[in-house]
């Protein structure tokens, strides 16, 4: 009887989800209620977690709670600590959820809400959550080893070193893209910058409070920190209007880049408990709380999605990013469906904290579903805005100009009606001087979120507060990832350099730490600066590189997972990883090839470099450049991007070839050859 009731409930969930999808897909030019998208997403996540993740856990991985985890075997109170699964879920989610799920879906909305919705949901169920689950599992079975170390074990030393180099390159690009989003959101925004700056002393106070005043009172200090942040948002409006402090906190992009680089360096070398840990707690509560609150707000407000299901820009002519739906929609959405960055987290701190093997499913598969839900919320925030407002915020100034009158005229010619008065009014409502060309996705998410919450309360009087609350929320999302990512990048640099200079590999050496941090910060700081001074806007060139590198790293993680399944003699289940691997590999390689060699300057790095090089030779200034120096910057940026893209492709192909030979050897072997740590069973540990 119980099985019948359970089956009926899940059948009902499936039917409701199918009906919601039908409402989204079959709209004929009519505005669709955003509630249907929330319902479809929740139904998909529920079914995928209940059935597909259980199948993987029970049949493919055979998770066994009798096996001691690395946290139990090496419990040292420092790196290896058995952690409650709910606490670890929050830690893991805070680490993986950066700007990607917020930015990618918003940019992808230029093609309409339906293509992005389908990939976010299908991609996370069959690829993204599978990758996170897989890497966390194989790392836990190998004492929490990193992705590069596992590749070295399973594929050979050469493939391992290549993987480590590729992972470091991708990490630098990821951090630079995240930091550039922060710069784009806070440049010339005194209210936003003051609010974010205020979180630093707040986090320091929280760190001291938890360590010396009230140790262990995480919930207590998190509430205090949250209240202090709300006060900072409120007071930020006064700061922006102040004749002295307003200009003081009004920083241009280049200055803000240097400030962020210095902050990243200091945050990376400070003790974790002083800044990173308290910000981690705050961001976890903020991330999960705000996303759930936003979903509830959508249910109550029931806003209509004004963006068409499929727009005219699926042909690749869109102003937000260039390129056709395949492959560029998939690399643009990136983290909302699958992220290679997660493979670094899932083989970093998280496997050293897992308390039971059965928790891997909840933490690995479940946290990625939560991040995908963040992507759905971002897509909704972009889609509930008038398309004219959306394109005004996300199109480069080179296309729409710098005045509301010019922007309105250009966007109207695209078939999306928006008036200068509307653009000026929205800027005034959110407390900004202008909203034009605020690329990067963060401002668009903030305006969309403020719009939804204002509809819940049926008042637009608080639009400015909710806008800056959303900016704070996003910045916490991003800065948490930048903080943790810079520290992880430092470890990767030290590991690589330590091969030649062993002293630098010592994480307890101040010289090694400072040297590694300097290289890491200089790496991502360089690309942020290039993005800021790029006359094309930076986002348009850096984010495709971020997406390609990120997706290639994900395909590499899945390739490693496929090899491990063959070496475990689980080849009958290898389709679980082979299918997403094949799709990701083809997509990312196609995107990489097009970004390097495409004949259109709006798409191909080399074509764009050639276009502006020719202009320099002829002494002709080509818009949006305003000088020959601007054109030289564009040429240099495109040449660097093409070289990096080619490097990522070479790394992925090298790993695929190494995997092919490793699988051949595994098939010839009669016994499993996977390099797992010997199983210590809980009963045996208790008797010994």
Regions found by a protein language model. Name each.
Residues 298-314, 369-448, 484, 529-534:
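Extracellular/periplasmic helix-exit of transmembrane alpha-helices
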Residues 1-15, 47-102, 284, 323-324, ...:
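Membrane-interface "cap" regions at the ends of multi-pass membrane proteins
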Residues 22-28, 33, 79-142, 153-157, ...:
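Membrane-interface helix-loop-helix modules in multi-pass membrane proteins
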Residues 188, 207, 211-212, 227-258, ...:
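Hydrophobic alpha-helical segments and their helix-loop junctions in multi-pass secondary transporters
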Residues 154-172, 364-373, 439-441, 459-470, ...:
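Loop-to-transmembrane helix boundary motifs in multi-pass membrane proteins
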Residues 31-50, 108-138, 148, 191-203, ...:
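Extracellular loop-to-transmembrane helix junctions
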